[in-house]
């Protein structure tokens, strides 16, 4: 988005057909090709889908319990919901709460909502039915 969002909910569907790292940036800024902020991870099984990663900052803030990885259906359409309210971020994959995390820096963050895909590596991620709602 070009607009900045404070409190919001985003619902979407994603499907991965090849290994690779992707995600949904929240309250993030763009400078050229550099995106700074927080990413809710979208990755193959065993790679922390639903966790929160801070780009150009502290790195991983929280990863989901490995047992929750069963919610992810690689090669199929998956539903993701992200709720951002104040300093709290809650992520869901196929109805399973992956993380529920509060962080002052996220709470103070300003920026848009962006989809991420790394270049190279043959990654294939598809997105559909993206709905963003202010809270």
What is each of the regions a protein language model found here?
Residues 1-135:
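Carbohydrate-interacting regions of secretory-pathway proteins
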């Amino acid at each position: 988005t070009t607009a900045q969002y404070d409190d919001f909910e985003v619902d979407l569907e994603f499907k991965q057909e090849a290994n690779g790292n992707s995600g949904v940036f929240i309250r993030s800024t763009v400078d050229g090709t550099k995106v700074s902020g927080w990413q809710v991870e979208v990755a193959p099984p065993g790679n922390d889908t639903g966790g929160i990663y801070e780009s150009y900052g502290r790195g991983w803030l929280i990863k989901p319990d490995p047992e929750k990885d069963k919610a992810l259906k690689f090669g199929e359409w998956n539903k993701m919901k992200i709720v951002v309210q104040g300093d709290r971020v809650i992520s869901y994959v196929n109805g399973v709460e992956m993380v529920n995390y509060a962080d002052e820096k996220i709470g103070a963050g300003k920026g848009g909502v962006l989809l991420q895909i790394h270049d190279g590596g043959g990654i294939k991620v598809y997105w559909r039915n993206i709905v963003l709602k202010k809270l």
